Every structure is written in structure tokens, then in C-alpha cells.
């Protein structure tokens, strides 16, 4: 029960961070780089590592860290989708190389865990439902 509660809190934190970052970038003209940094921090927290350190790794190494740390498959989907959304923000912030790395990291995670990434990273409609299903 404790593990399920922890997982639900983690998934809801991801959903909230993604939704808030999207809303702030869209509605409040927040710096897209700051939004990307926020998502990267949430990813690091989910794995128990500094986000900047984790995401400085190659895509294959990020997958290795997730596998070694035993990260829950539901969480890995949120991580991959957060990285994909982060790449959109980094593109807006004219950080092309870093945006490409985030896309590669997201795809590597998706490939390793059998995740279908959305065409539109900003479409969060199914994430809340997914988080609620994890709690069921």
C-alpha cells in the first residue's frame, strides 16, 4: 500500500509539473528554458538523482540508470514524456543540441520500455487518466 501511495504521488507530481510548465509557457510567457529545467529536475527527483547529472548522460546510459534503479514502468513513461516536452521547450529557447539530446533520451526510454510516445508532446490529456489508473 505504501509503495502504491508513493507511486501515485510521484505520477501526480509529474502530471502537475508537466501541466504547470505547459500552462506557464503558453499563458504566462515563461522562459521556455526555465520550463525545461523544471521538468528535468522532476525527472531527476523521480530517479533519486540530480536531474542535470542524469540528463547529461547518453540516451543509453539514462536507460541503464533507470533499469539499475528499478524505476517503475509507469514512471518511465512519465519520464520519457517529460523529456519529450522538455525538448519542445528547449527548441523554443533555441537550444537545438540539448533539445535533440532530450528527444534521443525520450526515444531510448520509450524503446527500452515499449512506450508509444505521442506525436504532440504538449498533449497531456491521457496522462491524468494514466496516473489515476496506477492508483486503482
Predicted regions and their residues:
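Hydrophobic/aromatic side-chain positions at a characteristic register within alpha-helices
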Residues: 6, 25-27, 84, 90-91, ...
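Structural register within alpha-helical repeat arrays
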Residues: 13-14, 20-21, 79, 86-89, ...
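The tetratricopeptide repeat
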Residues: 16, 75-78, 82, 119-127
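TPR/TPR-like (Sel1-like) alpha-helical repeat modules
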Residues: 32, 36-47, 97-115
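Boundary/linker segments of alpha-helical solenoid repeat arrays
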Residues: 47-52, 112-124
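Short acidic, glycine/proline-enriched loop segments that cap or flank alpha-helices
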Residues: 70-75, 89-98, 116-118
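TPR/TPR-like alpha-solenoid repeats
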Residues: 82, 89, 127-134
Amino acid at each position: 500500500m505504501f509503495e502504491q501511495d508513493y507511486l501515485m504521488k510521484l505520477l501526480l507530481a509529474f502530471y502537475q509539473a508537466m501541466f504547470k510548465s505547459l500552462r506557464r509557457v503558453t499563458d504566462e510567457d515563461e522562459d521556455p528554458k526555465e520550463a525545461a529545467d523544471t521538468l528535468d529536475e522532476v525527472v531527476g527527483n523521480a530517479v533519486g538523482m540530480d536531474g542535470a547529472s542524469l540528463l547529461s548522460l547518453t540516451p543509453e546510459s539514462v536507460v541503464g540508470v533507470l533499469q539499475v534503479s528499478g524505476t517503475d514502468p509507469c514512471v518511465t513513461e512519465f519520464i520519457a514524456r517529460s523529456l519529450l516536452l522538455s525538448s519542445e521547450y528547449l527548441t523554443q529557447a533555441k537550444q537545438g543540441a540539448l533539445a535533440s539530446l532530450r528527444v534521443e533520451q525520450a526515444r531510448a526510454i520509450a524503446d527500452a520500455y515499449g512506450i508509444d510516445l505521442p506525436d504532440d508532446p504538449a498533449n497531456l490529456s491521457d496522462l491524468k487518466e494514466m496516473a489515476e489508473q496506477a492508483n486503482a
